Amino acid sequence: MLHLRYEYLLAIVKAIVTLLSVVTIGAYMSFFERRLLGLFQHRYGPNRVGWGGSLQLLADTIKILFKEDWIPPFADRIIFTLAPIIAFTSLLLVFAIMPISPNWVVIELNIGILFFLMMAGISVYAILLGGWSSNNKYSLLGAMRAAAQTLSYEVFLGLSIMGVVAQAGSFNISTIVADQTHIWNIVPQFFGFITFYLAGLAICHRHPFDQPESEQELADGYHIEYSGMKFGLFFIGEYISLVTISALTITLFFGGWQGPWLPPYIWFIIKTTVFIIIFILIRAALPRPRYDQVMILGWTICLPLTLMNLLVTAIVILYNT
């Protein structure tokens, strides 16, 4: 009985520490991205608040908390309020199944991959609800774009993961990490990695797949009517999705927490940070394509590539058995 209580207490502590850390990192990503973009573009970036801009997060937090939390009179108040909460929560919960080290995972799910895909699907509902409840044509158009893009690229995301799942013989993310002891999945699943990363960019609505929020066409898309902390939940949620996709990329294709000499959680942090920097570098380097070009890329290149990768993986597994 005492041992059972200890396990429950440990699980609660893990959950609180992990989720608070992810929220803090997601909030701090705004400053980190602006500083990196400034470095890439030979300018300073935010450097006025604190030493080297280190207190910029505090300034942004104070600003967003004291902004008027305004709800348009023509909006559906209940759905308008629920949408950012659903988006933020669904993206945050994905980290509960992420193995940060051999002994640090909040929830050990045998259907971890399916749980991730389910949470990614729920975030689409939040975007649609937010765009529709705003009763604004630009919000609705942005929400429809986001839903179509996310649902399309979720197909490629799921198919690209299936090759990894077939190799490991499990949907459990910890098992997938353990299966990469001798060789990382980036080698046998290179095309799966490419499509997964592209689909991850699209699902996060990150540049160059940020058409749902394009300022020139849709005046910031589905969250145009949001302000205050409601906008903050959408804003931080997008950065949490960036961290989540980066963490999932290294977990599925780059051995997760595995590495020599350093502690496992340090390897997890280093690898995740590298892919976050790559995400930001892509934003600094690439132009934004048209919306139809994004959809054509998905259905004419990503889909055949994922199907080919899955077919080759199945043939190799059958041959080896």
Curated annotation (Swiss-Prot):
Keyword Iron among record annotations: no
Could you tell me the superkingdom of the organism this chain comes from? Bacteria
Single GO cellular component annotation? plasma membrane
Question: What transmembrane ranges does the database entry give?
Answer: 9-29, 78-98, 111-131, 156-176, 183-203, 234-254, 262-282, 296-316
Q: InterPro entries in the record, alphabetically?
A: NADH_UbQ_OxRdtase_su1/FPO, NADH_UbQ_OxRdtase_su1_CS
Q: Which reaction does it catalyse?
A: a quinone + NADH + 5 H(+)(in) = a quinol + NAD(+) + 4 H(+)(out)
Q: Name one GO biological process term.
A: aerobic respiration
* Matching Pfam families: NADHdh
Note whether Transcription occurs among the keywords. no
Please state where this protein is localized: Cell membrane
Give the EC number: 7.1.1.-
The UniProt keywords, alphabetically, are: Cell membrane, Membrane, NAD, Quinone, Translocase, Transmembrane, Transmembrane helix, Ubiquinone
**What is a GO molecular function of this protein?**
oxidoreductase activity, acting on NAD(P)H, quinone or similar compound as acceptor
Topology in membrane: Multi-pass membrane protein
What the protein does comes down to: NDH-1 shuttles electrons from NADH, via FMN and iron-sulfur (Fe-S) centers, to quinones in the respiratory chain. The immediate electron acceptor for the enzyme in this species is believed to be ubiquinone. Couples the redox reaction to proton translocation (for every two electrons transferred, four hydrogen ions are translocated across the cytoplasmic membrane), and thus conserves the redox energy in a proton gradient. This subunit may bind ubiquinone.
Family in the record: Belongs to the complex I subunit 1 family.
Q: How does it assemble?
A: NDH-1 is composed of 14 different subunits. Subunits NuoA, H, J, K, L, M, N constitute the membrane sector of the complex.
Tell me which PANTHER family the record gives: NADH DEHYDROGENASE SUBUNIT 1, NADH-UBIQUINONE OXIDOREDUCTASE CHAIN 1
Name of the protein this chain belongs to: NADH-quinone oxidoreductase subunit H
Q: Source gene?
A: nuoH
